[in-house]
């Protein structure tokens, strides 16, 4: 399993505005699995990145909302 950081907007019908970007952390096998897990939400997904090593540790230490959802 890997942890993915998902950058998204709350409404997929609106134009993306950088200042409104939100993030969520999801644990899954692949990016595709994470996308399937989130498909029923009304999110406009901008970008998904896999967190590993030092990057993952940094997010754990410095993110005020590091709560991981499980995509399974």
UniProtKB/Swiss-Prot annotation:
Pfam families: RpoY. It catalyses: RNA(n) + a ribonucleoside 5'-triphosphate = RNA(n+1) + diphosphate. GO terms for cellular component: DNA-directed RNA polymerase complex. InterPro entries: RpoY. One of its GO terms (biological process) is DNA-templated transcription. GO terms for molecular function: DNA binding; DNA-directed RNA polymerase activity. Keywords: DNA-directed RNA polymerase, Nucleotidyltransferase, Transcription, Transferase. Its EC number is 2.7.7.6. The keyword Electron transport does not apply. Belongs to the RNA polymerase subunit epsilon family. RNAP is composed of a core of 2 alpha, a beta and a beta' subunit. The core is associated with a delta subunit, and at least one of epsilon or omega. When a sigma factor is associated with the core the holoenzyme is formed, which can initiate transcription. A non-essential component of RNA polymerase (RNAP). This is DNA-directed RNA polymerase subunit epsilon. It comes from Staphylococcus epidermidis (strain ATCC 35984 / DSM 28319 / BCRC 17069 / CCUG 31568 / BM 3577 / RP62A).
